[in-house]
């Protein structure tokens, strides 16, 4: 059944929502969660502070919505790449390319770090935080690992899970360090390191 086109009001709301998320990413990365002000986010988006509250309940709600949106974008990108693969070997290659390409985005690791610090300090948001973490890990579910590596016994699955868990922090650490060592850790250098890390973790699997 064809999707009904959005009317002008819905399109405007959608545009505002997108602009607020984009502005929020800039402010949260630059100022951190604690330092970020909704008024600054509204100004960066070219909207009023009231518009922020029309779309999000609070700064926390906006922050988590941003993280969920960006996480979903990355998961969708990976899934789309894997759908084009005809074999497990091709899927591993596609995942490797996806992982190395993470070096292009210098804001996502900082945002991820902010999110993890937020999670440590806000136990009252436990349920939503847990769901966000599960979504962040959803690219490492059983279907994904079986697509790449075939049937796994318990020991093999445990090894894969540890390797997958290590990938994200390694990217975050390298990109964070690149702000202090830009000549040593250029994007090209980081891509090279990430490729080596991936091969070390998965080639022998």
Where in the sequence are the language-model features?
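Hydrophobic/aromatic residues within well-ordered alpha-helical segments
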Residues: 16, 59, 66, 70-74, ...
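Short helix-capping/turn signature of helix-turn-helix
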Residues: 56, 101-102, 115-121
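Basic, helix-initiating cap at the start of DNA-binding domains
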Residues: 1-31, 35-44, 61
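Hydrophobic alpha-helical connector segments
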Residues: 65, 78-108, 157-167, 191
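Amphipathic alpha-helical segments enriched in hydrophobic/aromatic and basic residues
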Residues: 28, 37-38, 49, 59, ...
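Short hydrophobic/aromatic patch on the recognition helix
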Residues: 45-56
């Amino acid at each position: 059944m064809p999707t009904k086109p959005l009317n002008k009001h819905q399109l405007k709301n959608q545009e505002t929502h997108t602009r607020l998320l984009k502005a929020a990413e800039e402010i949260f990365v630059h100022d951190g969660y604690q330092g970020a002000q909704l008024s600054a986010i509204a100004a960066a988006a070219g909207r009023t502070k009231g518009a922020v509250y029309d779309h999000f309940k609070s700064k926390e709600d906006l922050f988590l919505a941003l993280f969920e949106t960006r996480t979903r974008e990355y998961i969708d990108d990976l899934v789309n790449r894997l759908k084009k693969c005809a074999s497990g070997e091709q899927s591993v290659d596609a995942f490797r390319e996806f992982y190395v390409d993470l070096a292009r985005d210098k804001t996502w690791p900082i945002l991820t770090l902010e999110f993890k610090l937020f999670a440590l300090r806000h136990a009252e948001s436990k349920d939503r935080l847990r769901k966000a973490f599960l979504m962040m890990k959803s690219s490492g579910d059983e279907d994904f690992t079986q697509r790449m590596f075939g049937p796994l016994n318990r020991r093999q699955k445990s090894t894969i899970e540890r390797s997958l868990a290590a990938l994200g922090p390694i990217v975050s650490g390298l990109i964070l360090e690149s702000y202090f060592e830009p000549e040593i850790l250029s994007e090209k250098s980081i891509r090279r390191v990430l490729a080596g890390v991936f091969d070390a973790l998965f080639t022998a699997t």
